Amino acid sequence: MGQIEWAMWANEQALASGLILVAGGIVATAGRFTQWYFGTYAIAAGVLVCLLEYPRGSRAKGSTLERCGQRYLTAVLKLLGPLSRNYYFRAALHLALSVPAGFLLATILGTVCLVIASIIYLLAAVRGEQWTPIEPRPKERPQVGGTIKQPPSNPPPRPPVEARKKPGEEDATPAGGPPGGPRVNPIPVTDEVV
């Protein structure tokens, strides 16, 4: 049985919590809640979390599906160096970003989700995981001569000679009448109206 890669789960949880923070911040700011400035903070924090978490890290074993447009943000995260690779840093950052958003009811759900993502990142860091970017692999082109080992030795199955139609037989009319022509109705039709 394989080992669970916790960073993958933390990444999905943090990305979802960033989106939830943005949505709650929009509700709080547009609704002019009494502490609406926490809503604007939640929007900024949610956008930051989404930008940080959008690029997926590559898995230790197997292949990883890259998100659409991820390579551009991956280049930015590579520039941050060890700050973007270290999951201890991400856990602390997410925990610190979640505290001010917890003072407003509209953003409390995003706060709880971000705290859960922080805990999962801490678990991933304790287990020794770190973020590694998905590197594009060069596509291997199959060589035409290399894919075919031997041509087939048996011909494909064909119907018996008697069952095969010859080109001239299609024009000839069989005894029962042409297949595409008019047909004779076996039931007599009368045109009497009562």
UniProtKB/Swiss-Prot annotation:
Pfam families registered for this protein in UniProt: Cytochrom_B558a
Stretches for region Disordered: 134-194
Transmembrane regions: 8-30, 36-53, 87-104, 106-126
Residue spans that sit within the membrane without traversing it, per the record: 70-80
Top-level taxonomic group: Eukaryota
One GO BP: innate immune response
Subcellular localization: Cell membrane
Cross-link Glycyl lysine isopeptide (Lys-Gly) (interchain with G-Cter in ubiquitin) residue location(s): 149
Description of post-translational modifications: Phosphorylation at Thr-147 enhances NADPH oxidase activity by promoting NCF1/p47-phox binding. Ubiquitinated at Lys-149 likely by RNF145.
Topological domains annotated Cytoplasmic: 2-7, 54-69, 81-86, 127-194
Modified sites of kind Phosphothreonine: 147
Keywords carried by this UniProt record: Cell membrane, Electron transport, Heme, Iron, Isopeptide bond, Membrane, Metal-binding, NADP, Oxidoreductase, Phosphoprotein, Transmembrane, Transmembrane helix, Transport, Ubl conjugation
Residue ranges annotated as Extracellular topological domain: 31-35, 105
Family designation: Belongs to the p22phox family.
Oligomeric and partner information: Component of the phagocyte NADPH oxidase core complex/cytochrome b558 complex, composed of CYBB (heavy chain (beta)) and CYBA (light chain (alpha)). Component of the phagocyte NADPH oxidase complex composed of an obligatory core heterodimer formed by the membrane proteins CYBA and CYBB and the cytosolic regulatory subunits NCF1/p47-phox, NCF2/p67-phox, NCF4/p40-phox and the small GTPase RAC1 or RAC2. Interacts with NCF1 (via SH3 domain). Interacts with SH3PXD2A. Interacts with DUOX1, DUOX2 and TPO. Interacts with NOX4; this interaction mediates superoxide generation.
Protein name from the UniProt record: Cytochrome b-245 light chain
